[in-house]
């Protein structure tokens, strides 16, 4: 993958999640909305696919075996930082874990469990090149004062 990546395919996305049931759900929902969907069970497989395809959006789970979402984000930041703006992190990790994530360079964050319409709307906005609307897409609980 080079730092000057080719233009992305407007409706092509990749879902990176180790849960086969969630991958199947994402395929069904996103294909119904006109997206072409590829899937990867971990960060290593995802990087291989990302290096060969120009995705409009990358849905990324953080907690996976082998190469996790944090490790994939680090590799993308080193090798092709422009792709980070196409990443939508989806996670059920604790707030403490999520707080270690730098959300300034990614498109957004969605907490699991999530509303499927919220996810589809986020993927559509990201793939259309629309900037995220602050605060990032999230169902995270408010901090206690």
Can you annotate each of these PLM segments?
Residues 1-14, 117-145:
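Non-catalytic signal-transmission and effector/linker regions of two-component phosphorelay proteins
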Residues 24-32:
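Charged docking surfaces used in two-component/phosphorelay signaling
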Residues 34-41, 49:
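Short hydrophobic/Thr-rich beta-strand motif most characteristic of the beta2 strand and flanking loop
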């Amino acid at each position: 993958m080079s730092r000057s990546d080719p233009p992305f395919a407007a409706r092509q996305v990749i879902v990176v999640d180790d849960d086969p049931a969630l991958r199947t759900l994402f395929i069904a929902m996103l294909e119904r909305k006109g997206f072409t969907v590829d899937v990867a069970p971990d960060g290593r497989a995802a990087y291989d696919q990302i290096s060969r395809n120009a995705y409009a959006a990358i849905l990324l789970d953080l907690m996976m075996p082998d190469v996790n979402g944090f490790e994939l984000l680090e590799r993308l930041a080193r090798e092709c930082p422009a792709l980070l703006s196409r990443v939508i992190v989806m996670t059920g990790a604790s707030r403490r874990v999520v707080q270690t994530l730098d959300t300034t360079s990614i498109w957004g964050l969605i907490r699991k469990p999530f509303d499927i319409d919220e996810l589809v709307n986020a993927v559509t906005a990201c793939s259309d090149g629309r900037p995220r609307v602050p605060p990032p897409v999230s169902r995270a609980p408010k901090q206690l004062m």
